[in-house]
Each structure stands twice: as structure tokens, then as C-alpha cells.
């Protein structure tokens, strides 16, 4: 497409000093605009991807990859379901669970999800034992009515290890004074911290047998599965439900938090589209600078035409020159984006310590720190998009240059 002569002249125009200094300024602004857009876009998408990955990982530390639960009634033969699940080589662990919404009362009230577990089996499907800041998962012994609370939940309730909390379940019971919610006093035996505010403030864990007693329940809600490859969660859970041969409900990690993952993906897409406008502005500046360059080089174009360069050759010259500006801006932006992403958390900590401010409040953004996950496909797409915009921006100025008539251009020289 580009012959050596077009490339040589295009490179010469890129390095040459312009008679009009304003053209050089606009060309530099084009490079900076494209570079800034690429840098900001790479960094922002890396942060958005980092948030997605961090939230997903922290959720899955306490949540199952997949669940199989009984439909409309407790699952009674859960031991058989766990044993059957473990025969699947794709399953790393399986454990029974009971879940119910509850209202916890300490110095204050707070709704939370209450989960009943078997301690020695829970370690196969979650990292609860490793996330305990105080206490041990072995403290959840049947009949002792101990409870593990998220650190933020305990702080809100105003309780600590050794204190008591009253748990009110959504199930009701009939008493001499009327219908009352089921309630029981538990002793706080440990505090856990995952680093995800929704869990640290919204989950309480007790022994499964204790929960069965206060709920008058002789089965479990279902079985939780941890897999070697969580991308196969739905298939594995569906296969287990079929093998159990009953009316079971199947869910996996993508469906349990579908709204959250969808909103995060949408935010990343919208942010990418909006920030692409910065690159578009740089490309628009490139159009302006190239049009002015064509006007400035009319005499040169006329001489080239009289020496035998075709209109297509003239067009290629300015396409090469403009594309090189785009390439320089894009590569500068890619380098800047990669370097900024690698050092972003360090920069934010420096800003926070210098101005004594908190840029990312934990209670707002759910997680601590600023995670980044720079994905190669994102960088490739951004690079190709910037190069495409730059190339398209050269077409109109190059077409104008090709239309210049030598006689008209040299008339007033």
C-alpha cells in the first residue's frame, strides 16, 4: 500500500520544521491527546477488571462455586449427596449447609444471613477457618450455641468474643401469647474478616445441628460444592442433581450474584466508551493539524506532482505522516498506561499520606486497597482502536492534498 518513496517523504515531513509553528503545536497536541486517552483507558479498564476479580475472589472465599438444594422442602439424605458429589473428579469439596435470614440483636439490631455448617466439612468448600481473626471454627460445637460473626457485623452490634447476641429467625412459633419469631441466645466465639463488606457485615455462622434445633428442621437446605475449575460449576451441579434423581434446584456462583457481576461488566463497558472520547479528541486534533499541514505544504505538493508523483502517491505521503503521529501517540499511551497501572496503588498511597485523605472508603467500595488486573485483550483492543482512529483521521487531509493542482498551487509562489 505504501511504497518506499511515500514512506520516505512522510518521515521527512514528520521530522521537518514547519514554517507555521502553530501546526507543530497542534501536531504535538494530537500526539499528547492520543497518548493521554490510551493511558487513561488502559489504566481505568485495568482498575475496573481488578475490582471485578477482587470482588469475585472474595465472594467465592465464603460462597460455594455451586449449590444443589431441595425444592420446597429440606434435603434429608445429604450424606448421600455429599458422597455422590465427591465421586465426580471435577469436585474438590462438598459440604451441607442451612441458610436463613435472621435479625441479630446486641446493643443494636442488624439483619444478616445466618448459615449453619458442619465445621470439619466447611473447610472443604470455604476459607472461613483461615479468615478468623479471633477464635476458631472448632468452637462451633453442637449444643453449645456459639456463633461466628463478621468483624463489621460485630462492630455494628457492639459485641465481642464472649458476649451474647439474640438471634431472631424468620420462622415463627406459636406461644401462649401468640405467634412469635423463633429466637435463641448465642455466644460470640469468633470474628472473621474477608475484606468484602457485604460478607463482613452480613453473615453469621453457627453449627448446623444448633440451627436445625431452633428451626425444628430435620434436614438441610442443600449441599455446597467447591470445584477444581469454577467455570464448570453449572454443569457439575446439574449432573449431580440428575444423579440424585429428585426435584432439586441448581445454582452457581454466576447466578447467585448475577446482578452484581452484570452491573460491574456494564460499568466497565460504559466507562470504556466514555473514555474513548479522549482518543477521539486526539484524532480530531490530528485532522486539524493535517489539514493545516496540507495548506502549508501546497508548494511542495505541486513540485512533487510536476516531478511525476501521482495523486495517489501524494495521498499516501500524508497518510504515512499522519499515521506515524498516531502510532507515536498510541505507543506512548500504551507505555504510559502500563507503567501507571503497575504503580497506581503506590501513587494513591502517596496522595493519601500527603493530603491526609481517604480516596477509597472501605464502606463504599466494599474492598480495601486498589486492585488492578491489566488484561492483554483490553490492551490490544485499545491499541487497535487508537490506531484505527488515527488512520481514519488522515484520510480527509490526504484526500485534500491529492486534489491540489500544481498550476494553482504555484501561481502565487
Swiss-Prot record:
Membrane topology listed for this record: Multi-pass membrane protein
InterPro entries, A to Z: ABC3_permease_C, Lipoprotein-release_system, LolCE_TM, MacB_PCD
Transmembrane stretches, start-end: 22-42, 269-289, 322-342, 379-399
Entry coiled-coil feature ranges: none
A GO term from the CC aspect: plasma membrane protein complex
Cellular compartment(s): Cell inner membrane
Keywords linked to the UniProt accession: Cell inner membrane, Cell membrane, Membrane, Transmembrane, Transmembrane helix, Transport
Alphabetized Pfam families for the sequence: FtsX, MacB_PCD
One example of a Gene Ontology biological process annotation: lipoprotein transport
Function according to Swiss-Prot or TrEMBL: Part of an ATP-dependent transport system responsible for the release of lipoproteins targeted to the outer membrane from the inner membrane. Such a release is dependent of the sorting-signal (absence of an Asp at position 2 of the mature lipoprotein) and of LolA.
Family: Belongs to the ABC-4 integral membrane protein family. LolC/E subfamily.
Protein name, UniProt field: Lipoprotein-releasing system transmembrane protein LolC
